[in-house]
A protein has these predicted regions:
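C-terminal regulatory domains involved in ligand/effector binding and gene-expression control
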Residues: 1-106, 111-314
Length: 314
């Protein structure tokens, strides 16, 4: 069974109902463009985000090919979320997609390019390791109501969870409960890194300002002792103390101060929103309206969630 098939099952199952959010679909008011270094490839990449019609959703435009920001094209890759279609890949999409989902940019074209005119792969810039750069850029130009090509506004749907769902792998899990509003509770545990240890973060509510103030500025983190292994695996070629917070098992944080005492846990929430945004279709919300409780979740669990929905409800 393909991931696309599983998603369609999720979409048509009784587990979720696609209902109106009471809002209209939006897009960005005008284009924004940012250039920066990518974390894993180290390349310099330019991203231009442009307004799009309602119903078109979010999609990347790479080498004049369109790759929808959808679970249909998501690939499991180490340490980042990748979209892949027809041999073209766009890596590390999660922070950008998290910012677009959380701020309500439901429809947009994301042009992305690097200096390698022949390459088949491109990567979204990392900036400071958080979603701040994107949120600030979006706030600068603002949003507008998106209309379809006939000039009509379109209501924005969201997946509302009807029944509890629970998936797990070893000691990590994702549980989601029906809830009239989005709540996210996230736990991480690094017993071998005392400066991080066990952390839990729980969102009180989830409006745009909560994300901008409490989540967007939390940065990617990594364990110092794992950096060499990642470099040997061809990852984090663009990594530096400017685009991640680095923690040593014995010496604690190497580049303080943290922006939040529980910044690593908040960053996981940022990533989760980016990954769940891939459930969006045709300008809808991707993030399920539910109380989501996760502990040590990883990207593969989201896939498992998708399959879980298929197995149980068809
Ligand atoms: Zn991240």
């Amino acid at each position: 069974m393909s991931l696309a098939g599983a998603f369609n099952a999720f979409k048509s199952s009784t587990l979720v109902s696609w209902k109106s959010t009471g809002k209209f679909q939006q897009t960005i008011a005008s284009c924004i463009q940012r250039t920066g270094k990518a974390l894993h490839s180290g390349e310099v990449t330019t991203v231009k985000i442009c307004p799009e019609f309602a119903g078109e959703g979010r999609y990347f435009d790479f080498r004049s090919s369109f790759i929808r920001a959808s679970i249909d094209f998501a690939e499991e890759t180490p340490l980042c979320t990748t979209l892949c279609k027809d041999g073209l890949t766009v890596r590390t999409v999660e922070h950008l997609l998290s910012a677009l989902e959380a701020t309500g940019v439901d429809n947009c074209r994301i042009e992305i390019s690097n200096s390698d005119c022949e390459g088949r792969s491109v990567e979204v810039p990392i900036f400071d390791g958080s979603a701040n750069e994107w949120v600030e850029a979006i706030e600068q130009v603002g949003l507008k109501m998106a209309t379809d090509c006939s000039g009509n506004s379109c209501e924005k749907l969201a997946p509302f969870l009807n029944e509890p769902v629970h998936v797990w792998k070893n000691d990590s899990f994702i549980t989601a409960f029906p809830s009239p509003k989005i709540h996210i509770t996230y736990g991480i545990n690094f017993p071998q890194v005392p400066a991080i240890g066990c952390q839990w973060f729980s969102s009180a509510s989830f409006d745009d300002s909560f994300y901008a103030k409490q989540i967007a500025s939390s940065r990617t983190f990594c364990i110092y002792e794992e950096v060499e292994r990642m470099i040997n695996a061809g990852l984090i070629k663009g990594g530096s103390l400017d685009n991640a917070i680095v923690c040593s098992t014995s010496r604690g944080w190497l580049n303080p101060p943290l922006r939040f005492q529980d910044e690593p846990c908040r960053h996981k929430v940022l990533d989760l929103i980016g990954d769940l945004s891939l459930f969006a279709r045709c300008g809808s919300q991707g993030l399920p309206v539910a109380h989501i409780v996760t502990y040590k979740a990883c990207a593969s669990l989201y896939r498992k969630l998708c399959f879980f929905c298929f197995i149980l409800f068809l």
